Swiss-Prot record:
Pfam families: EPSP_synthase. It is an enzyme of class 2 (transferase). Belongs to the EPSP synthase family. MurA subfamily. It catalyses: phosphoenolpyruvate + UDP-N-acetyl-alpha-D-glucosamine = UDP-N-acetyl-3-O-(1-carboxyvinyl)-alpha-D-glucosamine + phosphate. Keywords: Cell cycle, Cell division, Cell shape, Cell wall biogenesis/degradation, Cytoplasm, Peptidoglycan synthesis, Pyruvate, Transferase. The keyword Oxidoreductase does not apply. It comes from Xanthomonas campestris pv. campestris (strain B100). GO terms for molecular function: UDP-N-acetylglucosamine 1-carboxyvinyltransferase activity. One of its GO terms (cellular component) is cytoplasm. This is UDP-N-acetylglucosamine 1-carboxyvinyltransferase. The keyword Isomerase does not apply. Phosphoenolpyruvate binds at K22, N23. It comes from the Bacteria.
Length: 424
């Protein structure tokens, strides 16, 4: 099984280009099932989860063509959904990726039936699918869970309705939003997720002919249409990848510019980096961070739904606090079991105490390289970041988690001066 070896001690300097957002491209690929003509998606990142989604679309009968593109143009995927013949998403594909549940709404709305295996993905606590089910039931769907599958049917077109999410759910909002696009009448979604990836999905749907207002706010209104046509959409840049590279620069005392970024989606993260002592300069599509060779200051943070601090950046900032001046307190309010990276950071010499959903991190002047194991996607990123500042070699096992969410991370870090390599 592949591993990554990081040799610490190098400050990062230079420029890096940000890839398309993992959490935007997956629902957008699923949304192509709603159309009755080919849809082209560009700025698609090279990620394992994208490959899994393409396999799933192909399994359903869609014709999928991948254009690898160039460094400047990027990768694009053309999906022709007119050949879809199956409405069952099998366990073999769904078990590796939670986002597979996002075919439920589109299949149900377009074909009146869908069977989707209960999802897998990162093992970071119970991420219930009840918000998806309740939301679709509010549109008139008949849903049962049998033998590990969610089975949904509708009698004719779904009917517009009002649904108030019990809790903010990004994928729940996306699934119900996609279904509502082809429902008869008006749908109002309250307490909807406001994440930029939800807005990007809505922008894609609008480009295909949907009528949506309020995406990016807690109240989304959808006027159902009879059909969606073909079209093109470019996926927005990945704010979590952007944040990860900025934290890497901050931890190593370096100076890095990230390009093809969207700093307007990163306010909470940029505020914390400024608090840590970084000088931040932004343009519409770039962020420059300069630590002037200094050690970062510890920061306190609490994860919460957008526009607050993202849970997907929590592990990276914990790594930063491990080598910062002072004590940082991190409160995780989104997912349970999302401190699984703590034990691995302790192996590198970190000083962390966990009390329930709170981690107290006392900064150490140095970390020491050691063999560690990735437990989920963002935890694997935090271990690489810690390895960048640890003495000696840090060997990270189970990096298949990393390939689910970061495109060529070792090449990108290497271009900034990191000593990092992948081994078999």
């Amino acid at each position: 099984m592949a591993k990554i070896v990081v040799t610490g001690g190098q400050a990062l300097h230079g420029e890096v280009h940000i890839s398309g957002a993992k959490n935007a491209v997956l629902p957008i690929l699923c949304a192509t099932l709603l159309a009755d003509a080919p849809v082209e998606i560009s700025n698609v990142p090279h990620l394992h989860d994208v490959i899994t989604t393409v396999k799933l679309l192909s399994e359903l009968g869609a014709e999928v063509t991948i254009d690898e593109g160039t460094l400047a143009k990027g990768r694009s995927i053309l999906v022709d959904p007119r050949s879809v013949t199956h409405q069952i998403a099998p366990y073999e594909l769904v078990k590796t990726m939670r986002a597979s549940i996002l075919v439920l709404g589109p299949l149900l709305a377009r074909y009146g039936t869908a069977e989707v295996s209960l999802p897998g993905g990162c093992a970071i606590g119970s991420r219930p699918v009840d918000q998806h089910i309740k939301g679709l039931q509010a549109l008139g769907a008949d849903i049962s869970v049998e033998n590990g599958y969610i089975k949904a049917t509708s009698n004719g077109r779904l009917k517009g309705g009002r649904y108030v999410f019990d809790m903010v759910s990004v994928t729940g909002t996306e699934n119900v939003l996609m279904a509502a696009v082809l429902a008869e009448g008006t749908t109002v979604l309250e307490n909807a997720a406001m994440e930029p990836e939800v807005t990007d999905l809505a922008d894609c749907l609008i480009a295909l002919g949907a009528q949506i207002e309020g995406a990016g706010t807690p109240r989304i209104t959808v006027q159902g249409v009879e059909r969606l046509g073909g079209g093109h959409h470019a996926v927005l840049p990945d704010r979590i990848e952007t944040g990860t590279f900025l934290v890497a620069a901050a931890m190593t005392g370096g100076s890095v510019t990230v390009r093809r970024a969207r700093p307007d989606t990163l306010d909470a993260v940029l505020d914390k980096l400024t608090e840590a002592g970084a000088t931040i300069t932004t343009t519409a599509e770039s962020v420059t961070l300069d630590m002037h060779g200094k050690r970062p200051r510890a920061v306190n943070l609490t994860t919460a739904p957008y526009p607050a601090f993202p849970t997907d950046m929590q592990a990276q900032f914990m790594a930063l606090n491990c080598v910062a001046e002072g004590v940082g307190v991190i409160n995780e309010t989104i997912f349970e079991n999302r401190f699984m990276h703590v034990n691995e950071l302790l192996r590198l010499g970190a000083d962390i105490q966990v009390e329930g959903h709170t981690a107290i991190v006392r900064g150490a002047e140095r970390l020491s390289g050691a063999p560690v194991m990735a437990t989920d996607l963002r935890a694997s990123a935090s271990l690489i970041l810690a390895g960048l500042v640890a003495d000696g070699d840090t060997t990270i096992d189970r990096i298949y988690h990393l390939d689910r969410g970061y495109e060529n991370i070792e090449e990108k870090l290497g271009a900034l001066g990191a000593t990092i390599r992948r081994i078999a």
